[in-house]
Amino acid sequence: MNKKEEVLEGFAEVFNKRAWLDKVKMEKALAGYAASEVHCIEFIGKHKDPNVTKMAESMYMTRGAISKLTKKMLKKQYIESYQKADNKKEIYFKLTAEGKKVFEIHEQLHKEFENRDQAVFEPIKDEQYDAFLN
């Protein structure tokens, strides 16, 4: 196995272990919500004027899939749609009180997981992060 394959395999292993560690707590705290709904809520909660196109590009889904997902979420009252006065064509989304609740739970879980994993990342120096990112 060459170095590139070793690095990719290492990343995959870390990703899979984190997913496994996070899964039980995430499923318990967000029971009743589909993973796609939670990711959509996360995107809407973190971005200004999110629309179908922005969400599709970020979530690597088709616009059709996002449209279907947002319609379902509108019906469940996790999100609301709105339009700007200067652009009646484009539809944007914002979180309802229920959506904000899910967003906050999800963010808190990520902070807990980050704290849990802190010991793994402490020995890594900035130069090493830079090497991975460049």
Q: Whereabouts are the PLM-identified features?
A:
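N-terminal helix-turn-helix DNA-binding core of bacterial DNA-binding proteins
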Residues: 21-64
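Charged, amphipathic alpha-helical coiled-coil/dimerization segments
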Residues: 71-129
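Alpha-solenoid HEAT/Armadillo repeat architecture
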Residues: 1, 45, 60, 122-125
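A cross-family signal for key residues in well-ordered alpha-helices
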Residues: 42, 104, 133
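N-terminal leader segment of winged-helix/HTH proteins
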Residues: 1-32
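C-terminal regulatory/oligomerization modules of transcriptional regulators
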Residues: 1-2, 126-134
